[in-house]
Amino acid sequence: MSNSKKLTKKELLEMYDKMLLIRHFDMELSKLYSRGFIHGMTHYSVGEEAANVGAIYPMRKEDLMYSNHRGHGQTITKGIDINKMMAEILGKSTGQCKGRGGSMHLYNLEVNNMGCNGIVGGGHGLSTGAALAQKMKKTGNVVVCCMGESATNEGSFHECLNMASIWKLPLIFYVINNKYGISMSQQRSMTVERVVDRAEAYKVKSFRSEERRVGKECRSRW
C-alpha cells in the first residue's frame, strides 16, 4: 500500500477520474448488453464507484488483487487498457484474455490484478494462498480480496479468515455491502447487522466505512 496517508489534490482528481470512467464504461456496457452484443451475464459497478476506487486506488502496483464477479470497477482502478477490457467483455480476440474470459474473468498480470472470479467466494482461498506466499518470500506486498457481503456466508471465508489470523498474513478482505445477494436480502441471509463484526471472532482488525469516506479511511488505515 502507499506510504502516504494524506491524499493530495492530484490524487483526489485521479480518483474522481477513475470513478467517472467506471460509471461511463458500465453505462455504455449496459446499452450494448440490452442490444444483445454481450453473451452471458455481466455485473455492473454503477453506484459502487467510490467504494471501488477508494479501496483499490491506494494499492501499489506490486500489491495483489483478487476480484469477484462484479469486478469492472476494481479492474479499471487497478489498471487496464480500457479498449482491451471492452473487447474482452464483447468476446473479441483483441480482448485482455483473447475474448475467453468475459465480464467475470478479467485480469491484468502487469499490475498484479490476479483476476475476477465468477464463483461467489472463489477468491478466498486463492488470496489466502497468495498472501502466505508473500509472507514466506518476505516481499512486503499486500493481497486484497474483494467480495460482496453474501460471500462472507461461504465456509471458505471463515476458514481463510481463521488461517490468515493464525499466520498473520498480509491479507485484506474487502467487503462491499450492497445489502442483497441477487434477490436475497442481508436480513434474510445473516443475523449480524454489521458484516465487519464477523472479523472479531477471529481477532482480525477491521473497520467499517461509508462509501463517501472510504478513500480517506482506506488510505489512512492501509
Located regions from the model:
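Cofactor-/ligand-binding subdomain signature composed of acidic, glycine-rich
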Residues: 1-39, 61
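Cofactor-binding active-site loop characterized by glycine-rich and histidine/acidic residues
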Residues: 27-30, 37-167, 185-191, 196-203
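Short, ordered loop/turn segments at secondary-structure junctions
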Residues: 70, 176-179, 211
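A positional/architectural concept
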Residues: 161, 171-173, 177
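Short, proline-centered helix/strand-breaking motifs
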Residues: 170-172, 205, 210
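Conserved catalytic cores of soluble enzyme domains
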Residues: 180-184
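Conserved small/polar residues in nucleotide/adenosyl-binding loops
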Residues: 212-218
